[in-house]
């Protein structure tokens, strides 16, 4: 991750096993490291592969220079994401996904990788939302990974126009993954 990594988090039930790390092979896409920080994610054996596939597909779909760049995705729990949400957004509650775009130096040192930033995704919130919305867990996880990635490459949803552009990009990327429109039947949110 672009900032110092926080200490290992226990699993979602308070145990403290070792973290698991995985990464995608280097190519024209960004190098993506997935850090499974909370063991509750072990219930979803394909979570890592799902996130990597979503990021690869998003990188292929958007007009952004991501080749050779690096990003990290932290699969965490509601408690940790609540702390991050409180610290960085002033909202003392869990959320499904947070993105932290990296500040880009004016001059990149030779040979230094360009950092896109970090994404954090909370298991319990993702599980609850998927269940409440009747969506497969991997579809919702893919959507949130894509959403987080789009924030790292400059998309936002602060205005109605931005939200429409971002949601259209999400729909197109998810369609490439064979995932139905996550906004079908919903009012637009900004």
Swiss-Prot record:
InterPro entries cross-referenced by the UniProt entry: MetalPrtase_cat_dom_sf_prd (IPR023091), YbeY (IPR002036), YbeY_CS (IPR020549)
Family (UniProt): Belongs to the endoribonuclease YbeY family.
EC code(s) of this entry: 3.1.-.-
Highest taxon of the lineage: Bacteria
The encoding gene: ybeY
GO cellular component, one term: cytoplasm
Name of the featured protein: Endoribonuclease YbeY
A Pfam cross-reference name: YbeY
Chain's role: Single strand-specific metallo-endoribonuclease involved in late-stage 70S ribosome quality control and in maturation of the 3' terminus of the 16S rRNA.
Coiled coil feature spans: none
Localization (cell): Cytoplasm
GO biological process, one term: rRNA processing
Cofactor(s) for this UniProt protein: Zn(2+)
Organism whose genome encodes this protein: Rhodopseudomonas palustris (strain ATCC BAA-98 / CGA009)
Residues reported in the UniProt entry to bind Zn(2+): 147, 151, 157
Region of interest (Disordered), ranges: 1-25
The record's free-text note on cofactor binding: Binds 1 zinc ion.
Keywords noted in UniProt: Cytoplasm, Endonuclease, Hydrolase, Metal-binding, Nuclease, Ribosome biogenesis, rRNA processing, Zinc
Protein's UniProt keywords contain Manganese: no
Top-level class of the enzyme under EC nomenclature: hydrolase
Molecular function terms, GO-annotated: metalloendopeptidase activity; RNA endonuclease activity; zinc ion binding
Gene3D superfamilies: Metalloproteases ('zincins'), catalytic domain
């Amino acid at each position: 991750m672009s900032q110092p990594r926080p200490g290992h988090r226990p699993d979602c039930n308070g145990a403290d096993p070792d973290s698991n790390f995985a990464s995608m092979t280097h190519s024209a896409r960004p190098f993506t490291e997935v850090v499974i920080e909370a063991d509750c994610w072990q219930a979803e054996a394909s979570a890592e592969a799902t996130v990597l596939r979503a990021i690869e597909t998003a990188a292929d779909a958007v007009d952004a220079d991501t080749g050779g760049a690096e990003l990290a995705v932290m699969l965490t729990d509601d408690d940790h994401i609540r702390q991050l949400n409180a610290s960085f957004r002033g909202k003392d509650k869990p959320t499904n996904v947070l993105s932290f775009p990296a500040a880009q130096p004016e001059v990149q040192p030779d040979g230094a990788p360009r950092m896109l930033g970090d994404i954090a995704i909370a298991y319990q919130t993702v599980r609850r939302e998927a269940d409440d919305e009747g969506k497969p867990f991997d579809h919702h996880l893919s959507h949130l990974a894509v959403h987080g990635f789009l924030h790292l490459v400059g998309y936002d949803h602060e205005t109605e126009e931005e939200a429409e552009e971002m949601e259209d990009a999400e729909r197109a990327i998810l369609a490439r993954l064979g995932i139905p429109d996550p906004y079908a039947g919903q009012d637009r949110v900004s």
